[in-house]
Amino acid sequence: MNILFATSEAFPFIKTGGLGDVSYALPKALKRKGTDIRVILPKYSSIPQEYADNMRKVAEFTVGVGWRSQYCGLLELEKDGVKFYFIDNEYYFKRNSAYAQMDDGERFSFFSRAILESINHISDFTPDVLHCNDWHTAMTIPMLRDQYFNNPKLNNIKTVYTIHNLKYQGRFGKEILWELLGFGDEYFSEDKFKYYDSISFMKAGIVYADAITTVSPTYAEEIKTEYYGEGLNGLLQSRSKDLYGILNGIDTDVNNPSTDMFLFDKYDVNNLEAKARNKEKLQEMLHLPKNRDIPMIGIVARLEEQKGFELIKEVIEELLQENIQLVVLGTGDQRYEDMFKFFAWKYPDKLSANIYFDGGLAQKIYAASDMFLMPSRFEPCGIGQLIALRYGSVPIVRETGGLNDTVFSYNEFTGEGNGFSFTSFNARDMLYTIKRAIGFYYDKDVWSKLVQRGMNGDYSWEKAAEKYMRVYSNILHKW
């Protein structure tokens, strides 16, 4: 089975969020299942030089963007047994950031068509399935169906479209249809691309894909409701039989406390004394009082409303009256950055606010913290709670999306559970749940079982890869 995996980012070349992790780890897992899977993404100028220097040129050709023809280079590089292709065009991809550019509609219109044109220039590979991810590659699917149906190399390709976050849809003015995408006015309709008075790239992918997946079973159900559906819930309900919720994994080779080079001390489930040493050394590094017995709560996240920081804002003063240390890492909304900076100044022995991002420090926080807080308003899957579990940091989460599928609240009567959770998006409920977790932290027998249960869980991509294989097989065997 030949799979072309189209994405706007992939670790270790470019990563701004969870999509980058998925686009590296899932293809590796699918490769182990025997597929010939190849990944295609833009050649951003920010790709580390060590990779750029080793890319081999496959082809050069032009790609139509409306009435213009734009240069396109196709390069390749193998990483961990998977072949990666890179779409090269400095005008579109030599930027100071991968996204949030004024011409993103044009950039990813070019990229969508360049993906299809590239297939014509890869002599040893024709995909059976084109697997597109999020809005940046969504328009590739209707282009394939309605503009390339006479191309003998492309006309039998089936399509899978994965929604990583429905909130970000790629919405642009309707003039983009004919100016950049080569579609006529008839595509500005409710059954095609129209989203109120604009067009939605993501909607186009959902309408035209043979199968649709999203990144957890709960999120697959949530997005069919008005609250989570971002205006597409009716469409998603109509495509329910083609919609699959497949839980993301994490790369357990990269996220492994027994081999993680970023940790002060490596450890495993049989050596939790070394985890405690990580805590003490992080306390020293961040100028917090050195005390292995005080519960440390970690937060590693984008500081934005989706992640539930409005709840923290409501009760942070009360939370910091508890005998805890709170370690925060991330950037985002100025309100939340300023909030954490202020309370770190007010309570320097209780709060360390690290308003930047550092992958090494993130790993240290997972290893050192006793609890990991994710009170998200919505969370399609979430990776933080999975890394936390693997590193023995007990998650405290709101029951939404993938958090609901992976964290099971501790039941003191049965002893079951691997974390703590609350249902309503409510600050008092969150605070109660944190206090409940702190209470059980001091019961060492209960806490050690929670930590061990989390560390012994299977968070690899193997189960997800099996489910994606079934989705691919289903659409390939449909008449």
Swiss-Prot record:
Presence of the UniProt keyword Transmembrane helix in the record: no
Q: What are the EC numbers?
A: 2.4.1.21
Q: Output the superkingdom of the source species.
A: Bacteria
What SUPFAM superfamilies does this protein's entry cite?
A: UDP-Glycosyltransferase/glycogen phosphorylase
UniProt entry keywords in alphabetical sequence: Glycogen biosynthesis, Glycosyltransferase, Transferase
The disulfide bonds in this chain are none
Record InterPro entries: Glyco_trans_1, GS/SS, Starch_synth_cat_dom
One GO term of the biological process aspect: glycogen biosynthetic process
Q: Which reaction does it catalyse?
A: [(1->4)-alpha-D-glucosyl](n) + ADP-alpha-D-glucose = [(1->4)-alpha-D-glucosyl](n+1) + ADP + H(+)
Q: Which Pfam families match?
A: Glyco_transf_5, Glycos_transf_1
Q: Which family does it belong to?
A: Belongs to the glycosyltransferase 1 family. Bacterial/plant glycogen synthase subfamily.
Report the protein name in the record: Glycogen synthase
